[in-house]
Amino acid sequence: MSYNYLKAARKIICIGRNYAAHIKELNNSTPKQPFFFLKPTSSIVTPLSSSLVKTTRPANSTFNGLNEDGTNPGPIFIPRGVKVHHEIELALIVSKHLSNVTKMKPEEVYDSISGVALALDLTARNVQDEAKKKGLPWTISKGFDTFMPISAIVSREKFSSYKSNLQDIFRVKCSVNGQLRQDGGTNLMLHPLHKILQHISTMISLEPGDIILTGTPAGVGELKPGDRVHCELLQNNDNIVDMNFECENRPGPYEFRET
């Protein structure tokens, strides 16, 4: 399976509050339109495996660019003083330019993506909460290095028989230290995939290689140094891709303190 697609990513757009149960667990309001934010591409980290070793980084560096094959294998870094939450999501990989799309049908999603991937939208929850209370942007809470763990791509040919109902065939799972925490079908999304693509395109042009995270189901929880994370993407209950990460203390001087 390939990670080369990551080299073409110019932006990562994340849909928030797209599962009712997740909205309820965080006591948030339900948006009438798809609500989104951005993550930097420097937050990308890819899984370790028997054939991949940690990327060699300069001392105290937590990102040194993607490798030639698109990988950036390493751990999830937990910054000091930060309460990090996992949010498992289906990722869409955009395959063509989309701008000012007035209407999109469900079956048109297939031709607009090159495939899907499994991703974690990691969130510095206490950093985000403080920013919200002060009415400040909360980009940093989503954008730390390694806060975008992502799998190899699953090519769209894998699900070519389901062009009209992609919304209904996927399921995402996240386990921490062997305990299942998140498990949700994409059929539970409040805003469907075609609406997400169409809506974003009216404000921000989508380009080939862009990554769109489509929201997380209920069950978000904290990650701590030493934790082992296992995530799965299923198609009609069959595993099509998974990923594993270990959590470590983040090197460097950063430490979050409430002000």
Swiss-Prot record:
Cofactor dependence: Mg(2+); Mn(2+)
Cofactor note: Requires a divalent metal cation for activity.
Alphabetized GO MF terms: acetylpyruvate hydrolase activity; metal ion binding; oxaloacetate tautomerase activity
Keyword Isomerase belongs to the record: yes
Keyword hit for Oxidoreductase: no
Annotated EC: 5.3.2.2
GO biological process, one term: oxaloacetate metabolic process
InterPro entries, A to Z: Fumarylacetoacetase-like_C, Fumarylacetoacetase_C_sf
Family stated for the protein in its record: Belongs to the FAH family.
Its job: Tautomerase that converts enol-oxaloacetate, a strong inhibitor of succinate dehydrogenase, to the physiological keto form of oxaloacetate.
Name recorded for this polypeptide: Oxaloacetate tautomerase FMP41, mitochondrial
Source taxonomy: Eukaryota, Fungi, Dikarya, Ascomycota, Saccharomycotina
Gene: FMP41
